[in-house]
């Protein structure tokens, strides 16, 4: 339209003027020339603005991407207290926390498809399984953070070439939870070494009480018992040499057990089974079974976390925590870091981003941050010299063990979990001698891996950003929300920001990787019919937070919506809902809409308290619904939409 007007003006300029007007011709031409010049400048300016509008929006998003440090958390538990604390300490850094998966295969998939985040956390970890990621991760060996870790523990994270890609946060301590009152009641001395531990088990058996048991239905209990009994030997020079070879990321050959340390480990396991009278019946015991026996005075000791001490003391049972007693006289605590942290090597290409990421890492490893990780009743047992040792009454009986740095970090590769469960279970059931167990374990480690089920169940033709953008929200989260709204068949879907793992990549997904697109820790769905007024209040609770529930702590923690668009105001770290539209029109109070809400069960109860419409059916696991959808054939992802404007 502007260009048509311009042509009309130029056409008018060429008209023949009557003689009576010739005297004013020069003045008119000059005036017209000035008008045309101004108009042409306006047209050019508008055309430039129009042509670059999209580019400007893209530049804004690129700037937001550059300013954002993404941290993937291995569990939703860290999202509620740990993540908000870290953000509060770094108000000038935009940190986006995403609940990923406790599985290194998940991060390998992200790496292979260009989606590896800036900072990774993982609990179920071994250098052996992390080897494929090595070249994509920063070497932290020369950082202050690595230098603060005691060498005893840092050695467990060193690659063959001396580089360090992963650092541990504080330890989850496992050992023996002991009912001291039972020992006093039957006048049985508390164990101080392996011989007195075995004697105590024998004495309790004589009075009809199990001296010791554990939840051997779980792979980690089998694995940690086997290693804990030989922690002293596995940390010798020979033990460390074998562990380094087993974990070497540069080696593609499969590594079995050595013949120096490991045969003795199975001998000690066999002796332990005999001394504690473990039988095939123990293989069916789960955590509730074991703690129930302990609570009822049917078992004097069980293998578990130090958190059990506080739990039972609160119930009035005189409970203490004791370490593993090695047969060579040493005492050790079995530990697993609550998680390990690694940084993406791509950060080294941008000094400003690397500096921000290192600030985030520093806070993540701080004493105050780590205190928000541990379970109630557990002490912060740090592997770092920067965190002072402050043991509470629950851990006072193992102070000497901790001060000696006798905190053994378990070998926790996927192979070790699986093979330990198989072999230790057969030892307990009486099917394997120590020698047979050693040979079976070694053979399984050396066996070629069975090809994984790689049947493709979902294909994404493009990658979508999982960074939150002020004008639109997160594209990958929008894809998931829009797709699930179609699956559930409701008008609207509301989801907490931790619902999705942000892994919408241009890739083929097998069943495992497709399932990993949903947050792994108890995400539930609840369907309701609401009026527009009720929906407004529900969305407000999601955006602004509610009493007793989750409160968004940064822009990345704002909810995801589908079927509506929302406008939110940001001020001093808090968020206010200022508008909702549906189909481009303001949501009416008297409208009737069907709504699906996604959150953990606890969050659903608080977010949907009060006037939240009429519930339709029972809550359901989102991951189950999603897996059924993608495995049903013909699954497709919806397109993303701009669902939020943040001002």
Q: Where does each model-flagged region fall?
A:
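Conserved N-terminal structural module of periplasmic/extracytoplasmic solute-binding proteins
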Residues: 30, 46-127, 190, 436, ...
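C-terminal capping/gating helix-and-loop segments adjacent to ligand/active sites or protein-protein/ligand interfaces
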Residues: 77-78, 96-97, 159, 335, ...
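Extracytoplasmic "Venus flytrap"/periplasmic binding protein-like
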Residues: 88-152, 181-192, 292-293, 301, ...
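Extracytoplasmic/periplasmic substrate-recognition and gating elements
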Residues: 94, 313-376
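Hinge/lid segment of periplasmic solute-binding proteins
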Residues: 123-174, 189, 224-225, 235-237, ...
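Extracytoplasmic/periplasmic solute-binding protein
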Residues: 165, 198-254
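Glycine-centered hinge/linker elements that transmit conformational signals in sensory
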Residues: 244-283
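Catalytic centers of hydrolytic enzymes
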Residues: 452-647
């Amino acid at each position: 339209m502007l260009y048509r007007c311009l042509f009309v003006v130029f056409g008018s300029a060429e008209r023949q003027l009557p003689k009576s007007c010739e005297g004013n011709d020069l003045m008119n031409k000059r005036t017209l020339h000035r008008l045309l010049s101004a108009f042409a400048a306006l047209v050019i300016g508008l055309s430039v603005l129009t042509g670059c509008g999209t580019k400007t929006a893209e530049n804004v998003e690129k700037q937001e991407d550059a300013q954002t440090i993404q941290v993937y958390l291995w569990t939703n538990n860290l999202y509620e207290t740990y993540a908000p604390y870290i953000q509060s300490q770094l108000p000038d850094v935009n940190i986006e926390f995403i609940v990923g998966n406790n599985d290194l295969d998940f991060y390998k998939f992200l790496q292979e498809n260009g989606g590896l985040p800036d900072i990774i956390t993982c609990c179920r970890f071994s250098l052996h399984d992390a080897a494929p990621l090595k070249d994509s991760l920063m070497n932290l060996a020369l950082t202050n953070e690595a230098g603060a870790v005691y060498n005893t523990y840092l050695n467990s994270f060193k690659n063959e070439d001396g580089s360090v890609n992963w650092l541990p946060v504080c330890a989850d301590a496992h050992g023996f939870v002991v009912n001291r009152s039972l020992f006093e009641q039957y006048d049985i001395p508390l164990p101080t070494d392996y011989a007195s531990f075995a004697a105590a088990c024998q004495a309790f058996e004589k009075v009809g009480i199990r001296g010791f048991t554990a939840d051997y239905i779980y792979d980690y209990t089998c694995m940690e018992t086997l290693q804990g009994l030989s922690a002293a030997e596995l940390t010798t020079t020979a033990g460390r040499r074998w562990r380094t070879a087993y974990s070497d990321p540069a080696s593609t050959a499969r590594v079995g057990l050595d013949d120096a340390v490991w045969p003795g480990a199975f001998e000690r396991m066999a002796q332990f089974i005999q001394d504690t009278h473990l039988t095939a019946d123990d293989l069916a015991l789960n955590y509730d079974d074991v703690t129930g026996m302990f609570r009822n005075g049917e078992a004097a000791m069980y293998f578990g976390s130090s958190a059990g001490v506080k739990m039972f003391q609160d119930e009035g049972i005189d409970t203490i925590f004791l370490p593993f007693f090695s047969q060579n006289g040493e005492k050790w605590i079995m530990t697993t870091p609550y998680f390990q942290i690694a940084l993406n090597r791509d950060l080294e290409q941008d000094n400003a981003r690397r500096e921000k990421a290192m600030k985030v890492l520093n806070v993540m490893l701080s004493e105050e941050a780590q205190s928000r990780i541990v379970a109630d009743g557990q002490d912060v047992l740090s592997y770092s010299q920067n965190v002072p040792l402050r043991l509470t009454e629950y851990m006072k009986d193992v102070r000497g063990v901790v001060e000696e740095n006798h905190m053994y970090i378990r070998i926790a590769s996927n192979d070790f979990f699986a093979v330990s469960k198989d072999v230790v279970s057969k030892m307990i059931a009486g099917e394997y001698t120590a020698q047979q167990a050693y040979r079976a374990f070694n053979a399984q480690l050396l066996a070629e891996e069975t090809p994984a089920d790689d049947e493709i169940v979902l294909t994404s033709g493009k990658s979508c950003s999982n960074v939150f953008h002020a004008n639109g929200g997160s594209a990958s989260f929008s894809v998931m929300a829009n797709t699930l709204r179609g699956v559930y068949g409701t008008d609207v879907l509301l989801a907490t920001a931790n619902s999705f793992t942000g892994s919408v990549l241009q890739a083929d997904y097998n069943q495992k990787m497709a399932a990993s697109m949903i947050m792994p820790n108890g995400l539930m769905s609840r369907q309701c019919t609401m009026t527009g007024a009720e929906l407004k209040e529900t969305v407000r609770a999601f955006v602004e937070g509610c009493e007793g529930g989750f409160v968004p702590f940064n822009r990345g923690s704002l909810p995801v919506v589908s079927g509506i668009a929302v406008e939110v105001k940001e001020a001093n770290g808090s968020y206010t809902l200022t508008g909702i539209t549906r189909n481009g029109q303001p949501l009416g109070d008297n409208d009737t809409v069907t709504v699906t809400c996604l959150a953990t069960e606890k969050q659903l109860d608080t977010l949907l308290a009060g006037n939240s419409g009429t519930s339709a059916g029972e809550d359901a696991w989102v991951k189950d619904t999603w897996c059924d959808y993608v495995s049903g054939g013909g699954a497709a992802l919806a397109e993303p939409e701009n669902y939020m404007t943040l001002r």
